[in-house]
């Protein structure tokens, strides 16, 4: 019966972590639950992955708001609907000047829930409904909508667990508004009753309106989004060329063509190692992964960019032959199985370091070349000291007192009441997501549109960035490409250029010999 649940990924608003939300629902006898965080899908994949542990059917959606003003809730009927919601949300996240309208768009495979406002006019389409909160029931008896009960559903929002959580919610809202708690407007808070109720208690509230319960159940029954979290498959771009067989033939050719460059005096051991690696790479579905890395680095070489291939990929002779790495695994007796094997769950890993001067152009090349591409996010959480400072401001503590609290050099029993509250609630919000950042170098290149998996936002780098992190990406078979920035490579390049300028008679210095 819950169409509007928030996790703590409703940043500086919600207080419940996704798994905790499922545990609370299970305890209250809830069998189907909709996660609809505010203007984000950051928690959706984790929520779906964990839901089977609690025998709860997950429903995915988004609570669209301007600030705290709820406009409407969108629920996905299926994966196509989820993709449509993500694409629509991303339009707003990519352009901060856009405001979410009062009327929802016409999106395929999506249910729309509007919050009921007394005396407001609504013109509802077939897939649109009015959400009736418990406190709306008295007004509804005198509303014309009482005669249109087939379009009315239960809307009990869930943002926190209990009164303690509501206090945390108010503190988060004060932090978000950069104001003293005592001056936080009521309009910036949720309702203290926005908690999950036992199923029977919720049922009793709507006992006079059984149609609402029936309509709500019907919506939840018709929402069926599915993702495969089995790590045996990859959802990276499947092919670099036209077909998987064509890709394999290209990879095979590149590997054997590279023998003359890497091994002028080759022997049978080289070919035996190549055949073994190619067989495993093909079996594990990583042919296109190698080809995409090869294409990126072919471009880098064409531009004269220095780079270093690191990570467990240095164990691969195929990577060495494709000039992805410069480490000879035969000479150093490195085991390919440390990189890829049929029993290893972790994805393959190439860490490619570029000069800080060249990395931006490489990133641009990747986004220009590959269609379904995005940067990966990281969740920047409240660290204890940050929480202390933010809550210190909310409670009006002077900076000198906050400085003492952040050092930890104090006697808790000698602190005044406000300082003790700061310490108390800092331990509660420590670890809560505070804002989304950008992974140091992680890029995903997907077979399906990125919005199939989640919404994207646009950070200062101006490239679409996922709202899920690398761990969730791996859970759904999206393995990142690490394009990293190394200032030292830029300095080495500058040094070789200076040497070449001062000693033009000397042969050019190869960075690989340094």
Question: Residue ranges of each PLM-predicted region?
Answer:
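Alpha-helical scaffold/interaction cores of sigma-54-like transcription cofactors
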Residues: 1-514
């Amino acid at each position: 019966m819950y169409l509007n649940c928030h996790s703590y990924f409703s940043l500086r608003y919600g207080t419940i972590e996704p798994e905790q939300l499922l545990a609370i629902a299970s305890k209250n006898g809830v069998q189907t639950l909709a996660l609809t965080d505010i203007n984000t899908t950051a928690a959706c994949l984790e929520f779906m992955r964990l839901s089977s542990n609690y025998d709860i059917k997950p429903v995915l959606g988004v609570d669209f708001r301007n600030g705290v003003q709820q406009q409407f809730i969108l629920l996905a009927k299926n994966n196509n609907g989820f993709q449509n919601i993500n694409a629509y949300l991303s339009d707003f996240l990519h352009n901060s000047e856009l405001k979410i309208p009062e009327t929802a768009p016409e999106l395929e495979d999506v249910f729309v829930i509007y919050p009921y406002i007394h005396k407001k006019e609504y013109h509802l389409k077939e897939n649109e409904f009015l959400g009736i909160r418990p406190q709306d029931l008295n007004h509804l008896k005198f509303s014309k909508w009482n005669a249109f009960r087939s379009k009315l559903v239960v809307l009990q929002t869930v943002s926190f667990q209990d009164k303690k959580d509501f206090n945390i919610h108010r503190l988060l809202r004060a932090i978000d508004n950069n104001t003293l708690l005592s001056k936080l407007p009521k309009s910036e808070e949720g309702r203290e009753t926005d908690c999950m109720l036992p199923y029977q208690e919720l049922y009793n509230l709507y006992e006079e309106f059984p149609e609402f319960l029936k309509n709500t159940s019907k919506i939840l029954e018709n929402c069926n989004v599915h993702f495969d979290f089995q790590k045996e498959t990859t959802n990276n771009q499947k092919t670099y060329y036209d077909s998987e067989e064509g890709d394999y033939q290209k990879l095979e050719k590149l590997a054997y063509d590279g023998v003359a460059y890497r091994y002028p005096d080759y022997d049978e051991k080289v070919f035996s190692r190549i055949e073994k690696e190619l067989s495993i790479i093909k079996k594990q579905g990583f042919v296109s992964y190698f080809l995409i890395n090869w294409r990126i680095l072919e471009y880098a070489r064409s531009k004269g960019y220095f780079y270093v291939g690191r990570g467990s990929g240095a164990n691969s002779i195929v990577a060495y032959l494709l000039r992805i790495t410069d480490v000879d695994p035969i000479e150093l007796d490195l085991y390919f199985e440390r990189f890829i094997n049929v029993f290893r769950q972790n994805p393959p890993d190439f860490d490619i370091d570029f000069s800080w001067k060249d990395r931006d152009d490489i990133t641009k090349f990747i986004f220009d070349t590959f269609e379904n591409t995005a940067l990966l996010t990281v969740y920047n959480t409240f660290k204890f000291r940050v929480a202390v400072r933010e809550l210190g401001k909310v409670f009006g503590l002077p900076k000198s007192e906050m400085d003492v609290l952040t050092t930890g050099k104090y006697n808790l029993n000698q602190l005044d009441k406000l300082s003790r509250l700061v310490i108390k609630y800092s331990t509660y919000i420590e670890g809560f997501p505070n804002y989304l950042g950008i992974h140091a170098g992680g890029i995903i290149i997907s077979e399906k549109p990125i919005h199939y998996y989640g919404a994207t936002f646009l950070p200062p780098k101006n490239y679409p960035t996922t709202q899920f992190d690398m761990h969730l990406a791996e859970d759904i078979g999206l393995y990142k490409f690490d394009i990293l920035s190394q200032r030292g490579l830029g300095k080495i390049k500058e040094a070789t250029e200076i040497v070449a300028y001062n000693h033009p008679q000397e042969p050019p210095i190869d960075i690989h010999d340094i």
